[in-house]
Amino acid sequence: MMNTDETIFALSTVFGKSGVAVIRISGNHALKALNHFHVNKDMKPRFATLVDLYDSSDQLIDNGIAIYFPAPNSFTGEDVIELQVHGGKAVIKIVLEELSRIFVMAKPGEFLLRAFLNGKFDLTQIEGIADLIDAETKMQAKQAIKQMSGELEKLYSSWRQRLIAVQSKIEAYIDFPEDVATEKNELEKINDEVQTLVQSIQEHLNDNRRGERLREGLHIVITGEPNVGKSTLFNFLARRDIAIVSEYVGTTRDILEAHIDIGGYPIILSDTAGIRESSDPVESEGISRAKKRSCEADLRIELFPFEQRYNINCNVISSNTIYVLSKADDVINDHDIKISDIDFLPVSILKGIGTEKLVSVIKEKVEEKFVYDRDVPVITRQRHRNCMQKAIEHLRRFNMNNPIELVSEDLRLAASELGVVTGIINVEEVLDDIFNNFCVGK
């Protein structure tokens, strides 16, 4: 664990040319930074003050803005100074060098760690901040902001408090066993409360991994035989030339990926090798990988050549597959073509036929994967899911017919798992894993 007694500093903005660079200082001695830069002004809390910054040789470095956030009403809960200087590399280097004479450079995530230790955020909120920083689409950002606002923490803490309340009643029966026989009605209420919690947590787990999918990206695979236009469609959806498009069979051998945004949802799009029998060991490996990726995908776009539409034979129909007639250069509209009870969408990338409709269908399919009550917080990380699963295992062992000490222990262990998610129960390796993934200035 990091030493939180030292005063730390770091650049909070990207190093390089910019209009403004922000340097954050946090700790008991943060105000000494202003003395070091020969700033003799009275700092009014949370007000921007224009300052001239001088180095150790009394040479002017820059004129900028300083803002003082006194503890505990700051981001970290400690005294914080934020310096805003011109975003040139030389200015930033000199300011950081001067600060290193009196303070310690912050480690990755150290500002947030201090905020967590000072009760400014719980772990789920900090993970929400990380997700907001990493968000590439509108829907990812919306989910991160909800988590950052503390919705998950409120849910998990309410469950934990209910378990603690039940456990306290059980503990009372341990201390006063003569009351157990006369309180059968109360014991039934306890059992009902635990079973209600089990149901609530199980419903929370039965979410089809929506939160994790939104955070990580939905996997869509383009599949089909060789030379049906998979790479052309891949490049079209990716809006750039990634895959090599060729008339030669077997050009695409390994899996190509592109991260795209469709309707605000993050998509990991994969182009795969054409499915066929091949004696070429390299192509065969590519085909094997293509089949595996197709099985693992959340959605598939399966291509069939338009000119062979009367010979199509689909043995398995899947609601997770969009069926496309590719290279449909001769069609006059994008109306679906029904073949063997399957609606095929004719698409011609060359003539722009069916492309808008295909994107619309993809968006509809993607949205179906994320249909849920927007007011209910969702699991966003495997860490949360693991703890919830462990908690529910302990609660399923709960049985009022067991020795009352074992009943109490099951409740304690379940409450502990809920506490691990929010950080009330301190697990050092979990903290290290979360905070080390942040940049230095966070």
Curated annotation (Swiss-Prot):
A single Pfam family, by name? Answer: TrmE_N
Kindly list the positions annotated as binding (6S)-5-formyl-5,6,7,8-tetrahydrofolate.
24, 82, 120, 442
Task: Please list the residue ranges annotated as the TrmE-type G domain.
Answer: 217-367
Q: Give the location in the cell.
A: Cytoplasm
Q: Which cofactor does it need?
A: K(+)
**Where does this protein chiefly localize?**
cytoplasm
Residues noted as binding Mg(2+) in the record, renumbered to the chain:
231, 252
One GO term of the cellular component aspect? Answer: cytoplasm
- Which keywords label this protein? Cytoplasm, GTP-binding, Hydrolase, Magnesium, Metal-binding, Nucleotide-binding, Potassium, tRNA processing
Query: Oxidoreductase: present as a keyword of the record?
Result: no
Extract one GO molecular function annotation from the record: metal ion binding
Q: Name one GO biological process term.
A: tRNA methylation
What family does this chain come from, according to its entry? Belongs to the TRAFAC class TrmE-Era-EngA-EngB-Septin-like GTPase superfamily. TrmE GTPase family.
Q: Which PANTHER family match?
A: TRNA MODIFICATION GTPASE GTPBP3, TRNA MODIFICATION GTPASE GTPBP3, MITOCHONDRIAL
The protein's job, in short, is: Exhibits a very high intrinsic GTPase hydrolysis rate. Involved in the addition of a carboxymethylaminomethyl (cmnm) group at the wobble position (U34) of certain tRNAs, forming tRNA-cmnm(5)s(2)U34.
Q: What is the designated name of this protein?
A: tRNA modification GTPase MnmE
Q: Which organism is it from?
A: Wolbachia sp. subsp. Brugia malayi (strain TRS)
